Amino acid sequence: MWPPGSEDSYSAKMDYGKSVVNILPSVEMLVNFNGEMTRSSKRSCLLYAERVDFKELLQLRLTEKSDQRRMYITTVDSASFQDLKQDQSLNVSFSGFIDNVVRMLKDCQSGKLELHLTTRDQNLSSGREVHDYYLQFVEIRSFKNLVHLSLPCRSAPLNTVLFYINSMLEASHKKQYILEQSMQQMQAEINAQRAHAERLTTENTNIREALAENTRILEEKHAAEVHQYQEKLSKINEQRSNELERNRRAISGFQAQLDKASLEKAELKSAQEQAEKRCQTLSEELSCCKARVCTLKEQNDKLHGDVANIRKHERKLEYKIEDLKQHTVELQEHIQKGNKEKANIAAELEAEKKILHTKRQALEMASEEISKANQIIVKQSQELLNLKKTIAWRTEVALQQEKAVQAKESLLSLRENELREARITIEKLREEIPQQLQSMRNFAQGLEQKYSKQILILKERLAIPTGKENRR
C-alpha cells in the first residue's frame, strides 16, 4: 500500500486498499548488504511486492526484521521502466517485466538467485537522482557473479516508515479485535459447557445412587432364585443320569445299525463312483458328438452359402453375357456403319484430291503467266528508264521541243501510275494466293478468269504506249 501524500502516491482520491494488489505474498529472505566502508553482510528481511491494478506501477519494499525502521523502497513506473529498458537492454513489456520480477523473486526464495542491496557510487550520481542504493538480482557463479536486473532503491523517509508501521499496527489491532471477539465467544461457550458438565455430574450422582439401590435389590432377588435353581438342578441331574444309562443302551444298538449302514454306504459309494465315471465318459462322448454336429452344421451352412453365392454369381455372369452379346451386336452394327462411312469418305477424299490436283495445275499456270507479266513489266521499266534518259538529253538539245517533252512527261506519268497499279495488283495477288489455296474448291474458276482478264488488260495497256512511242 502506498502512503497518500508522499512522492510515491499516484492519486489522493483513489481507494488504495482496493487498487493495490500483492503480486507475491510477503516472505522472509536473506539480503546481502554491500556498503562502501563496511563488509558485505547478510540480514534477514521482509519483502513486500505490490502493483496497481489500473496503472503501470510496481513497488518492492524491504524491511529489516530486526529493526522495522530500516526500510528500503524500489518504485518502478512507466517512465522509469523505459529508462531501465534502455539502460539494461530489456526486451519485454511492463506486464512481462512484472512476471519476470516475480519469477526472479521466487528464484531468490528457492536459493537459485540472491538479492543484493548495493550502495550507489555518489561520484557517478547526478543531482536529480534521489536513490541511494541498487537492488540487484544476482546469480552466484564460480568465475563471476551475473547481475540479471538492477533496480534503483532508496531509504524510506520517516513518514513512509511510520505510515507502514501504522498500517501494520492497524492490521494487528484488527486481528486483536477479531481474536478478542472470538475469545469472548469461546469463553461463553466454555461457561455453557461447564454448566452443562455440572448438570451432567449431578445427574450422574443421582443415577449412581439409584443404580446401587437397584443392585442391592437385584442381588437379594437373585440369591433366592439361585437357591431354587440349585434344588431344581439336583433333581435334573438325577433324571439326567437315568436318561444317560438308557441312552447308552440305545447308542450301542444304533452303533451296530450304523456299522451296517456304513458297509452299505461304502458299497453304494463304489457303485456311484463307477456310475459317475461312466456318466463322465458318456458326457465327454456327447460333447465330442455335439462339437462334431456343430462343425458339420457350420460346414453345411457354409456350403449352402457358397452354393447361393455361386448361383448369384452365375446369374450375374449370365446377365453380363447377355449384355456383352447385345453390346457386340451394337458394335458390329457400328463397325458396318463405320466401314460404309469410311468408304464414302475415301471416295470423297479421292475426288477432292483430283480436284485439288487440277486446281494446283491451274494455279501453276497462272503463276507462270504472272511471272511472264513480271518479266514484261521489268522490260517496260527498263524502257522507261531509257526514255527518261532520252527525254533528259533532248531537253538539253533544243527549247523548241518543250511542248513535245511535256506531252512525253505526262505520258510517262500516266505510264508510271499504270505500272504502280499493276505492281499493287500483283502484290495483292501474291498475298491472296496462299489464302485462296484453302478455298480453291469454290473460287478456282473465278481466279483463272480474273487473272487472265487482268493479264490481257496489262498487255493492252503496255502495248498501246509502246506503239505511240514508235510512231513518234
Swiss-Prot record:
Subcellular location field: Cytoplasm, Cytoskeleton, Microtubule organizing center, Centrosome; Cytoplasm, Cytoskeleton, Microtubule organizing center, Centrosome, Centriole; Cytoplasm, Cytoskeleton, Cilium basal body
InterPro entries: SAS-6_C_CC, SAS-6_N, SAS-6_N_sf
Phenotype for S452A: No effect on binding with Gorab or homodimerization
Cellular compartments per GO CC: centriole; centrosome; ciliary basal body; cytoplasm
Top-level taxon in the UniProt lineage: Eukaryota
Pfam families in UniProt: Sas-6_C_CC, SAS-6_N
Coiled-coil blocks: 178-441
Keyword Metal-binding on entry: no
Necessary for interaction with Gorab as annotated region, ranges: 351-462
Tissues showing expression: Expressed in spermatocyte and speratids (at protein level).
Keywords: Cell cycle, Cell projection, Coiled coil, Cytoplasm, Cytoskeleton
Ranges of residues in domain PISA: 53-105
BP terms from Gene Ontology: centriole assembly; centriole replication; centriole-centriole cohesion; centrosome cycle; centrosome duplication; ciliary basal body organization; protein localization to centrosome
Domain notes: The 35 nM long coiled-coil domain mediates homodimerization while the globular N-terminus links the dimers at an angle of 40 degrees to form the inner ring.
Subunit comment: Nine homodimers form a cartwheel structure with an internal diameter of 23 nM and radial spokes connecting to the microtubule triplets. Homodimer. Interacts with Gorab (via C-terminus); binds as a homodimer to a Gorab monomer.
Function statement: Central scaffolding component of the centrioles ensuring their 9-fold symmetry. Required for centrosome biogenesis and duplication. In ciliated neurons, required for centriole assembly but not necessary for cilium basal body and cilia function. Required for sperm cilium basal body elongation together with Cep135 and Ana2.
The protein's name in its UniProt record: Spindle assembly abnormal protein 6 homolog
